[in-house]
Every structure is written in structure tokens, then in C-alpha cells.
């Protein structure tokens, strides 16, 4: 799912609601509600009354937000049967039923039979719930929250009772001016874990993907529109702000790529190991028939043979439909459950949910550019591309032999040039085990056992200098193993940096290295395993971002600052990280931030203030000031869309700071938990960190003081980023980022 922020008048901008009214205290047998009267909640947020569209004679009984123009209706009683008589009124019967009389035309709507009561009244609660209450016991006999329309308010809920089959769903209006039941229904599924599903008639229209039980969406208003869009919005000032809309993209429509198809940026593709079912139709853009497996699986339960199937991980996935929940305590257990079940086609271990497996065709799968989950799909081992026919192997022997002879000569010359250059340009230390003070040297066979011989099912991510694997030692301790790619021309220097630096650095906000392995050409780093992956997987994921509210984000900002302050001032070595960004901030099981990936770090003496190096590296500044703004806004630094304009996040932050003090920069998903003074302070600090003159930027000691006290801060000047962004885009790129040098993309530490 994708979150889209923009100001909106929402739904009823062009529709005029007509009503002239005065308030009454409540509804009882002696005091009905007539046209021209309203019933308000005690907190003044909601109002019940009669309304019509564009001077029409058709009147509806509804609930709306009081005092907000244009009026936004959240519940309608008589959706299918408007009243036309000017004497229409809402009364309460002796058996506690609400009755809407259409003058001499009789009853237009009824709440239905309720429990026996000797006296009752109707009230509008502070949550927007119309309730019928027993006068003697005080119990609720009927409530509108049990009969939802097209809108869900914060304290109402979608529901599916497995025992009775009873459902509470949202049903769309026929049009913006006709509240009768429309074509779309929003419901939750009976699956475990559940997911939201929009139906158009009997066919799925949009699906959210599985929800974690811990996720709590405290949002003011959720609507299923007459066009089938799910919209989540909040009122801010005089406007409605649309926090989320779905479907918003062609990939959001259910099953657009068919079985075993995967939608990537509006284009359908087949999973690895699959091909289009009908190639000619696929080429014409008719993708609904999907894909089929290229190589049939030959599964043997409990098989450990090399010719058995293997699991191929696919990252950034919206999990497909038709999953089943399996009781597994961790990703390894999930892998084993699927491995030993021949009908299991894929598995995914999702934080906050657990283990999901698929025994049916993959349907409605989407791959995002960031975020999402890792889906490991079962493929025949031949899909690895490692098994060649004997004829091909035989025909290649002569050519290969000749290649090796010529290659050996070229390799020898290349090694001489590398060593010659390295002696002048590389760091003044050799890659030897004894250099790793304080770290434990692991045996290669120990790491191979822990990572299942570096199996693909254990692979967490792929970076510029190699791959990262999850492992489990014999004592049960989980580890992350960074395996240097032998084809990397720069990787050894970065590898040596990480060993020498991290082995001597100890701080709760730095990732801890457990040891290394140096055997032959193999170079491995062994880290502590981070259960919650990296910070970017939360910030830029429309579902996970809701799990980190403002207090947690502020704690993360302070934790990063503490780690950087330690590197700059308090550690035995003075270290500049040089590649700090949210993807290099890992989160432990308690969501504590830990700085990782020291491949580009540089040591300097206590008297040195310049980092002299020819290598172009990552982000500018001490704490990567953009990180503060990304954590606050939940948006990536490179481009930030606001309305019809596209600008850098820093440019938008500066404009927001000048106009409103920066509060509208805050990620709207955490607005309910924010502390405005802290937010404004963090934005001001972020702008100070990107000042053009170094003297205007705070050092790490000043940064820590700014984040932990309430002392007055200097006023920031307009950043150079803002001045030059439009005038010279190539120049601004040099200023803003050189993140092409990112050294690892780790999805699951």
C-alpha cells in the first residue's frame, strides 16, 4: 500500500446540504426529532438531524460532523427510503424501537425490535454513535455502530463473527448525492491474520494484505466511496487531509496480474521460475491468466538431497492472497514447516504476525520499491541455473581450458597492479587475523552450519560488497553474517574498516560485532542479529510506519545522536561514519536504534578536523540531518511531492518552517501522539545541521544538548539546498546525496 498526503475538501465539495435547525436535548416518547431540529453529542463534535441534497424534497436522517463546512455525513438511517413530508419525524416507541415517520405515508425506517424495556431514550454519544438506552438499567438496547453505512469512525469497527456468520461491513453510496446502497462493500476476512477486502458485487476489488494484531489505526474517518476507493482522512484546520487511498495505482486492483503474476510499477511480471501462461496475450498486456511454473516440482518430504527443491526469496512484497497461518516461533521454524510440506509453495515470516504459508496459487501479489515483506517461493533446483547438460559441459571443456591459461596470465598481471597501487593508496594495515583485537575468530565450518551453507532461504539482503545471511549458532544465538563478494574491487578495504573499527567500539546505539572469519579468499563479518530490520522498513512502509509513534521516533533520533556523539567524542577511536542514513539504522527487539555498516567509516586523530580522502561517500553532515527530517515526516529525502510540486524534503522543510514553524511536516500517521514543541525543535535542529557555513552547524556535543534540553536555539538560515535546487539540478545532486555508494541493503537482520 502507498500513503499519499495532500489537502482535500473530500467527497462533498461540490454538493450543497440544506438544513436549518435548532437543537434538542434528547429523543423520548414525548419529544421526537422533527425536520429543522438537531440532536448534538455532549462534546459538540457530532450532530443528528435531517438533511437534503441541492434543495431536493427528499430528506434523510443522518449524523454528521458538527460545524464543519462542507458538511460530511457519516451515517444515514433511511438510505433507501428518503422522507418527503415536511412533518416527518424520528420517534421512539414503547418497545424502544426508533421509528422514522414520513408524515401520513407511514414508517419510512425502523431500527427493528429490541430487548424489552419499560422506558427508553435516544442519545448521540461523543463517539458519533446513536444509541437507545434503557431508562432504568442504563444498558444500551440498540446502537448505530452495529449498522454501519459507508463510514467507520474511531470507535466503530468492522467485524466478522465466525460462530454466527454475522458481519459488520461498510457499503458505498450509489453516488455522492444518493446514499442508497452502492456497488462496493468493505469487509474484513475470516483469515488469520485478517485483512481488509473491498468487494464489487461478488468479485474482489482491492485487498490490504495481512494485518498484525498489534496494529491500531486510530484514524478519524474511514470511508468506502461510491467509486470503490477506501479513503482514510482527518480534519485539519479548515480542510480534510487524505492520509490514505486505495486503490491508488493500477497494481492495487485485485489480481491484475493473475495467478503467480507479480505487479511491479504498473507492469506485470512472472515470478522467477514461472513463465506467462499465454505468451501472446501477455505481450498484448492481457495479464489476467497469469503465469505457470516452468519446471515441475519433485518434492520429497524431509528430503535433504542436493537435488531437492530450494526457496528463492523475493523482497518488498505485498503478500499474496490465500495464505495460511502456521505456528512457528521464528523465520527458521517457518522455513522448516514449508520445507517438510510438499504442498507448501511459499512462506513468509512477518514481524508482528508470524509465519504464513501458501498452498494455493499466488494471487494479487505486488512488489514495492521499498518496504513490504520477504516471500520465499519454492522452485526446482534446476532454476538455479547450476545444472547443465553433460553435452554442454563436454563441449565447454576445451574452451574453458584455453580461457584459464590466458586468464591466469592476465590475473597475475592484475594482482601485481593491485598490490602496487594498494601499497600507495590503501590503509596502512594488512588483512590479518591478529589485527582483530577483541573479536572472536569463527571457523568457516561453524558459519556454514549456522547459515545452512549460505542457503538462499537464509539470505537477508544483497549489497554492493556482498550478501548478508541470517544464521543460528549451536547455542541457539541468532547472528547476521556479512559475506564479502570476491568480485568487489573495493570491498576488502571496507571489510577491514569494519573489523578494526567496530571491534574497538562498544555502545548501546552501535551494532555489536561478534567476530569474523578469514579463510582463504573468504571474508566474513558476524554481527548480532537485529529482529526489527532497519528503520527505513518502518518509515517507508504504509502499514509498519503506524507502529512507531512520535515518542518512539523521538527516542530513535536521540539514540542515533548518542551513537554519533560516542563515535566523534567518547570512543577510543575518533570515527566519521560517512554513510549514515535510515537504511543503516537497525532496530533491536525493543526498537532501540543501532548504527550499522561502517564500511565507509574513517578514523582520525584527536587533533584532526578534516577527513582527507579522494573517495566520494554517503550523506553530508554529522548526524545525517536529513535523517531527522525523514524520521519526522516518514518521507524519503530525495524527492518530496507536495500538491502539484515536487521538491526536496529539505526545501519543503524550510518552507514549512518559515510558514508554520514546521508542524505540517510531521507524518500525519503519528499526529495523534505528537508533542508539538518536540517536533518543531527537531525540525529546527535538522535545518541547523544543513547550514552552508560549517560554523553555523552544531557539533555532536551541541546536538545532544539541543535534543535533551529546552534551551533557546539559533534561528536557521535558508539552506543552500533550497537556493540551488531548481537553478542547477546537477549541482544539487552533488550537494544532496551520493547514495549510489550504499554498501548494503539489509532486509532482515
From Swiss-Prot:
Keyword Kinase carried by entry: yes
Every PAN domain range: 299-381
Subcellular localization, as worded in the UniProt entry: Cell membrane
Domain Protein kinase as annotated: residue spans: 454-721
Major localisation: membrane
Signal peptide span: 1-25
Record-annotated membrane-spanning stretches: 393-413
Active site positions, chain numbering: 579
Domain Bulb-type lectin positions: 26-145
EC number(s) from the headed UniProt entry: 2.7.11.1
InterPro entries: Bulb-type_lectin_dom, Bulb-type_lectin_dom_sf, Kinase-like_dom_sf, Pan_app, Prot_kinase_dom, Protein_kinase_ATP_BS, S-locus_recpt_kinase_C, S_locus_glycoprot_dom
UniProt-annotated glycosylation sites, renumbered to this chain: 54, 95, 118, 135, 286, 302, 341
GO biological process, one term: recognition of pollen
Membrane topology: Single-pass type I membrane protein
Region of interest (CaM-binding), ranges: 543-560
Protein keywords: ATP-binding, Cell membrane, Disulfide bond, EGF-like domain, Glycoprotein, Kinase, Lectin, Membrane, Nucleotide-binding, Receptor, Serine/threonine-protein kinase, Signal, Transferase, Transmembrane, Transmembrane helix
Cytoplasmic side: 414-749
GO molecular function: ATP binding; calmodulin binding; carbohydrate binding; protein serine kinase activity; protein serine/threonine kinase activity; ubiquitin protein ligase binding
Any one annotated GO CC term: plasma membrane
Reaction it catalyzes: L-seryl-[protein] + ATP = O-phospho-L-seryl-[protein] + ADP + H(+); L-threonyl-[protein] + ATP = O-phospho-L-threonyl-[protein] + ADP + H(+)
Extracellular side: 26-392
Domain annotation EGF-like: ranges: 247-280
Bridged cysteine pairs (disulfide): 251-263, 257-268, 334-355, 338-344
Enzyme class: transferase
Family that this chain belongs to: Belongs to the protein kinase superfamily. Ser/Thr protein kinase family.
Protein name, entry field: G-type lectin S-receptor-like serine/threonine-protein kinase At1g61460
Organism expressing this protein natively: Arabidopsis thaliana
Taxonomic path: Eukaryota, Viridiplantae, Streptophyta, Embryophyta, Tracheophyta
Amino acid at each position: 500500500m502507498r500513503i499519499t498526503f495532500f489537502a482535500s475538501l473530500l467527497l462533498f465539495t461540490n454538493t450543497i446540504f440544506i438544513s436549518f435547525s435548532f437543537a434538542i436535548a434528547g429523543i423520548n416518547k414525548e419529544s421526537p426529532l422533527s425536520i429543522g431540529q438537531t440532536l448534538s453529542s455532549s462534546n459538540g463534535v457530532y450532530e443528528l438531524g435531517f438533511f437534503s441534497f441541492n434543495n431536493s424534497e427528499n430528506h434523510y436522517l443522518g449524523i454528521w460532523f458538527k460545524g464543519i463546512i462542507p458538511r460530511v455525513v457519516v451515517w444515514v438511517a433511511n438510505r433507501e427510503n428518503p422522507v418527503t413530508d415536511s412533518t416527518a419525524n424520528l420517534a421512539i416507541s414503547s418497545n424502544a424501537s426508533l421509528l422514522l415517520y414520513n408524515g401520513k405515508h407511514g414508517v419510512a425506517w425502523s431500527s427493528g425490535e429490541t430487548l424489552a424495556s419499560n422506558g427508553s431514550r435516544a442519545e448521540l454519544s461523543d463517539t458519533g454513535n446513536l444509541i437507545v438506552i434503557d431508562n432504568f438499567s442504563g444498558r444500551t438496547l440498540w446502537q448505530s455502530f452495529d449498522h454501519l453505512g459507508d463510514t467507520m469512525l474511531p470507535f466503530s469497527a468492522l467485524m466478522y463473527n465466525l460462530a454466527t456468520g454475522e458481519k459488520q461491513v461498510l457499503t458505498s453510496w450509489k453516488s455522492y448525492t444518493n446514499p442508497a446502497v452502492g456497488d462496493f462493500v468493505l469487509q474484513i476476512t475470516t483469515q488469520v491474520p485478517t485483512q481488509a477486502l473491498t468487494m464489487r458485487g461478488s468479485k474482489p476489488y482491492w485487498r490490504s494484505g495481512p494485518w498484525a494484531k498489534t496494529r491500531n489505526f486510530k484514524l478519524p474517518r474511514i470511508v468506502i466511496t461510491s467509486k470503490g476507493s477506501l479513503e482514510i482522512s482527518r480534519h485539519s484546520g479548515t480542510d480534510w487531509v487524505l492520509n490514505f487511498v486505495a486503490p491508488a495505482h493500477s497494481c492495487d486492483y485485485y489480481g491484475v496480474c493473475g495467478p503467480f503474476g507479480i505487479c511491479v510499477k504498473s507492469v506485470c511480471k512472472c515470478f522467477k521460475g514461472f513463465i506467462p501462461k499465454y505468451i501472446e496475450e501477455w505481450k498484448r498486456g492481457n495479464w489476467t491468466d497469469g503465469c505457470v511454473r516452468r519446471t515441475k516440482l519433485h518434492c520429497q518430504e524431509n528430503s535433504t538431497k542436493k537435488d531437492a527443491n530450494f526457496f528463492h526469496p523475493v523482497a518488498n512484497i505485498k503478500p499474496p492472497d490465500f495464505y495460511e497461518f502456521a505456528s512457528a516461533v521464528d523465520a527458521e521454524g517457518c522455513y522448516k514447516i514449508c520445507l517438510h510440506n510438499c504442498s507448501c509453495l511459499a512462506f513468509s515470516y512477518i514481524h508482528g504476525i508470524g509465519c504464513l504459508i501458501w498452498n494455493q496459487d499466488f494471487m494479487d501479489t505486488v512488489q514495492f520499491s521499498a518496504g513490504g515483506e520477504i516471500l520465499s517461493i519454492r522452485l526446482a533446483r534446476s532454476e538455479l541455473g547450476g545444472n547443465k547438460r553433460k553435452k554442454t559441459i563436454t563441449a565447454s571443456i576445451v574452451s574453458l581450458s584455453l580461457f584459464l591459461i590466458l586468464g591466469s596470465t592476465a590475473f597475475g598481471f592484475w594482482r601485481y597492479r593491485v598490490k602496487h597501487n594498494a601499497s600507495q593508496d590503501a590503509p596502512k594495515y594488512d588483512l590479518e587475523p591478529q589485527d582483530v583485537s577483541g573479536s572472536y575468530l569463527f571457523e568457516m565450518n561453524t558459519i556454514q552450519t549456522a547459515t545452512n551453507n549460505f542457503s538462499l532461504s537464509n539470505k537477508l539482503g544483497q549489497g554492493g560488497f556482498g550478501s548478508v545471511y541470517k544464521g543460528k549458532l549451536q547455542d541457539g544465538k541468532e547472528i547476521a553474517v556479512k559475506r564479502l563478494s570476491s568480485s568487489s574491487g573495493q570491498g576488502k578495504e571496507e571489510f577491514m574498516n569494519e573489523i578494526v573499527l567496530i571491534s574497538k567500539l562498544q555502545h548501546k546505539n552501535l551494532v555489536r560485532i561478534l567476530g569474523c572469519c578469514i579463510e582463504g579468499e573468504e571474508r566474513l563479518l558476524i554481527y548480532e542479529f537485529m529482529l526489527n530490520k532497519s528503520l527505513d522498513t518502518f518509515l517507508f512502509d504504509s502499514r509498519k510506519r503506524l507502529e512507531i509513534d512520535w515518542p518512539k521516533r523521538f527516542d530513535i533520533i536521540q539514540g542515533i545522536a548518542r551513537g554519533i556523539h560516542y563515535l566523534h567524542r567518547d570512543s577510543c577511536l575518533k570515527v566519521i561514519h560517512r554513510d549514515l542514513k535510515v537504511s543503516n539504522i537497525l532496530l533491536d527487539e525493543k526498537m532501540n536504534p543501532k548504527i550499522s555498516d561502517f564500511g565507509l567509516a574513517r578514523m582520525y586523530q584527536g587533533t584532526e578536523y578534516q577527513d582527507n580522502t579522494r573517495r566520494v561517500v554517503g550523506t553530508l553532515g554529522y548526524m545525517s540531518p536529513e535523517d531527522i527530517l525523514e524520521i519526522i515526516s516518514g518521507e524519503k529525502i530525495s524527492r518530496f511531492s507536495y500538491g502539484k510540486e515536487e521538491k526536496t524534503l529539505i526545501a519543503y522543510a524550510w518552507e514549512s518552517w518559515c510558514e508554520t514553524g514546521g508542524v505540517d511536516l510531521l507524518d500525519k500517521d503519528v499526529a495523534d501522539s505528537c508533542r508539538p514543541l518536540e517536533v518543531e525543535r527537531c525540525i529546527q535542529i535538522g535545518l541547523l545541521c544543513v547550514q552552508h557555513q560549517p560554523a553555523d552547524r552544531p557539533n555532536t556535543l551541541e546536538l545532544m544538548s539541543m535534543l535533551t534540553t529546552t534551551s533557546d536555539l539559533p534561528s536557521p538560515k535558508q539552506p543552500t539546498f533550497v537556493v540551488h535546487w531548481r537553478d542547477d539540478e546537477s549541482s544539487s545532486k552533488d550537494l544532496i546525496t551520493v547514495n549510489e555508494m550504499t554498501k548494503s541493503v539489509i532486509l532482515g537482520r
